[in-house]
Every structure is written in structure tokens, then in C-alpha cells.
């Protein structure tokens, strides 16, 4: 089997949230190594499971893991933000459940050749889909100082964004920044001594910011939240796991917006807008990992699961 092995986060909670019917149609928009999907398909008899991933390495690993169940599985190489197009291509109008496990999977982080990790030397890449044209190399070596400052601050919530952006531009004037550890060295050089003594790795926020920019991660989340709810049939559920506040804010606000009813001013005697709630939110507060899961998988610490049901 492929080396793409990923420990699924909030697995039991996701299965419960999706309320799986044996004859239902379910979508895993972030298939990865098929950890969640392998448990979903076991609960299907005449149903169908659609797995989507932009990473061909993940798709290959998933196809091996799901081989015994391929009579009820369709695997698609695409971005989850293209959900509409994927379902249209399969002539499927509505589904019973959609699962999204956002963020970078452990195998992508652990495979040093992909350039996601600040702990090992590799070419600056960070593309989840190797066929995409934009890589971390282009972002670091061609984007303006202001563009770099903006993504470091907005996507990485990095307080030293101006200093790091300036250091990147100065270094690349001498020679291009080509590897992950070169970039780590530049980031370290821009930070004050007290920041280097913090528990968190000094490059963590910057690498997150560049990865999000390279893969348009927040744009993809916004787009899928616009199309996912309309593609659920009545009683269908959307379950989304986020790993940082930027994603979580988008998901939370999209679900709240879909759960809104009338938006007329309180002074109006009767409703004239005609808006009806599209979903019921099933998680007043997001579901988080318990102590047992955190002991097994420390990367689950920042995971939050939000769930809504189509009305």
C-alpha cells in the first residue's frame, strides 16, 4: 500500500454527525488517505460514496484502501470547491451528506519533498496539486513586499509580518530563496530574540500563510460553503472540520447565514423579504477532540467540527 497514511481526526464524531443511511449518497471533499471514507463506505449497502482530492498521491492511496468497496465508490481528482461540477459530471442532483476535513494532511506535512515542513530541507513547493502553476517559490521570490506582508499578517496572523517580508525581499535580491530551510533562516533573521525563544517554531505562522496563499485555501472554503448547502437534500448534513481560526470563521459565518430566516427590520409588521432558514445548526459550539484522541494524535488539538442539517 502507498505510504500515504493519515490519522483521521474526530472520526466517530463525524460518522455520528453525518447520520449515515445505507442507501444514501455521501461526499468526502477532502479524501486524503480515506480514513473517514473507509468507515463511511462500510456503512453503505446500495448507497454511493464520492471521494474528492486535488492530490493524486492521496487518490492513489485511497483507491488502494477502498479497493474492497469500489462497487459503491467514485473517486475524483478535483478541488472540493468544484463540488457543483463534480456532482453534475456524475448526474447527481442532491446528496445526503458532505464531509470536509480542511487543512494539510499529515502525510503532506511529513513528506519533506513536498516543501510544507519547516523542519526538513526541501525545494519551496507547498502545492497540494502538483499540476498547479503557483508554488511557494514563486510567492517568496516574485511577490512584492506589500503582498508578502499582507499574507503573512492575514493568513499567518504573524505579528512580525513587516519585518519578515522585508527580510525576504532583501535576501532574494542577492539570490533566489530556493529551499525551506533557507526560508526558515530568513524568517529567523527578521525576528527579535524573545520571539525565537517562544515554544512555537518561529517559521510556523509564515509557512501556514504561504501554504494558504499557494493553494488558495480560504477561497476554496468560501466557494464550497456557497455550493455545498444547496446540494444537500432535505435532512442531509454538512460536517466541516477546521484547523485554524481563519477557516473556522468562514464556516461558522456561512452556516449562521444559511440558518437565518427573515431579515426584515423589526419595525416591519409582516415579512416582505421571504427569506426562509435553509439549515438548522446542530453544533451550537464546535465539537473538539477529547483527551484520549489528543494523546493518540496531538495534531487534533486545534480541530473543530461544525455540523448543519438541510431543512
Task: Report residues per predicted region.
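S-adenosyl-L-methionine-dependent methyltransferase catalytic core, i.e., the SAM/SAH-binding region
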Residues: 1-311
